[in-house]
Amino acid sequence: MKILSIQSAVAHGHVGNSAAVFPLQRIGVEVLPVNTVNFSNHTGYGAWRGSLITPEDVHDVILGIEERGVLPQIDVVLSGYQGGTGIGDVIVDAVRRVKAANPTAIYACDPVMGNAKSGCFVAPEIPVLLRDRVVPVADIITPNQFELGFLTGTEPLTLEATLDSVDLARAMGPATVLVTSVERPDREPGTVEMLAVDGAGAWIVQTPHLPFKANGSGDVTAALFSAHYRATGDAAVALERTASSVFDLIELTYQSGERELQLVQAQNVYAHPRMQFSATRVR
């Protein structure tokens, strides 16, 4: 499997491509990383150095890949945080080019906008770009509850409401939706859930909630789920594998006392997930 991953990159820490590439490689995926920023560290520190890569330069790299005759081999286009509308246009164009070369390829979009605690932390034009131009061309999207609510104009607070919101999101274009960090009022205390929905049904998986949020964990989640789903075509299996790996990664990071994801130290949990969590069919 080959994945074209168009995301940010940092020297210190693990977000964007710096989070997604290594776990994908450890499960046997050939990754073509195209970076959209080159920063010293992620912006959660409040200070960073480096530069945005212009949409023109990102587009140029993709054209170079196309000129090498590689696009017919691409199985998945993956994108995450988008810093401006120009990058969004480049990603949509890349998806069009890849699908023209390989009609079986899919596009997996992590529509990064914010979360319930922090609100929206991207430029004001980005949510509209994602909703109106990017998500409609995606085959898979991986929003959290907050992002799902914005995309669909709903408040998905209960499981039933979340499923209804997912139906609205799927009507926009993407056949498969992974809702990360689902927090419904009636869930078991001390847990968090992920919900995967495709044309075959809907499944939810519950894991212990760790008192720790590591930047980049969502990027790993989107990457692993997209790869597992492309490989198996089974949303429940992809959900179980992803939940197992990501939980163990976050738990190891939490136990280490480090701020950044212990991505390398946890490498075996990607290649050999424990499969300690079972997905429950909810529809």
Residue ranges and their predicted role:
Residues 84-85, 115-120, 181-186, 211-215:
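Short, small-residue-enriched loops and turns at beta-alpha junctions
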Residues 149-150, 212-235, 239:
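Short, small-residue alpha-helix embedded
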Residues 11, 202-216:
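Short pre-catalytic strand/loop immediately N-terminal to key active-site residues, enriched for Gly-Thr
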Residues 2-116, 266-272, 278-283:
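Conserved N-terminal subdomain of the carbohydrate kinase-like
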Residues 29, 63-71, 96, 100, ...:
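Generic secondary-structure signature for well-ordered alpha-helical cores
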Residues 236-283:
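Charged C-terminal helix
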Residues 120-202, 231-236:
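Conserved phosphate/ATP/ADP-binding segment of small-molecule kinases
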Residues 15-16, 46-47, 118-123, 152-157, ...:
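Short, solvent-exposed loop/turn segments at secondary-structure boundaries
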